[in-house]
Design a protein with these regions (language model features):
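Structured C-terminal helix/loop/strand segments within mature extracytoplasmic catalytic/sensor domains
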Residues: 69-122
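Stable alpha-helical elements in mature extracytoplasmic
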Residues: 5-9, 28-32, 108-111, 115
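Non-transmembrane alpha-helical segments in soluble domains
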Residues: 10-17, 33-37, 59-62, 116
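Active-site Gly/Thr loop motif
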Residues: 34-89
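A general structural signal marking secondary-structure boundaries and capping sites
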Residues: 19-20, 40, 119
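Active-site-proximal alpha-helical segments within enzyme catalytic domains
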Residues: 1-21, 78-94
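Structural helix-adjacent loops and short alpha-helical linkers that scaffold large soluble proteins
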Residues: 20-28, 101
Length: 122
């Protein structure tokens, strides 16, 4: 079993947003992060809109069409969203075992998009 706080998950998310570095230390190679999170580098069947509607999939990350934007999702509604360009992360802890996981995921991603747009208007 693995027990972690939201702060622990936020540290992991920031490390990923910084291409494998945290506090000046390299934890994962930038090449690994790029391979895992770049939707164009995934094999057929895992590219955008092939793995699941409106996502791609790579190395346990759900990938969005925009490069550098991806998320991890737990079975009970846990969510870590990462936008590498803006260094924005979203961490949600949950123990919801409802069956509407797909709808919950879409709503959570839309929340993440709204947060990014609000703090980084273009």
């Amino acid at each position: 079993f693995f027990n972690a706080t939201q702060l622990d998950y936020a540290k992991v998310a920031m490390m990923l947003a910084n291409m494998g570095e945290i506090n000046g230390k390299r934890v994962l190679s930038a090449e690994y992060i790029d391979q895992a999170t770049n939707v164009e580098r995934q094999p057929e069947g895992f590219k955008f809109n092939q793995a699941q509607m409106a996502t791609g999939y790579g190395y346990q990350f759900w990938l969005r069409e925009k490069p550098g934007r991806y998320f991890m999702q737990g079975v009970y509604g846990q969510y870590i969203g990462i936008d590498r360009d803006t260094k924005t992360i979203l961490v949600i802890n949950s123990s919801d075992n409802a069956e509407a996981a797909g709808l919950r995921s879409l709503r959570t991603y839309r929340l993440f998009q709204s947060v990014i747009a609000a703090i980084n208007p273009q």
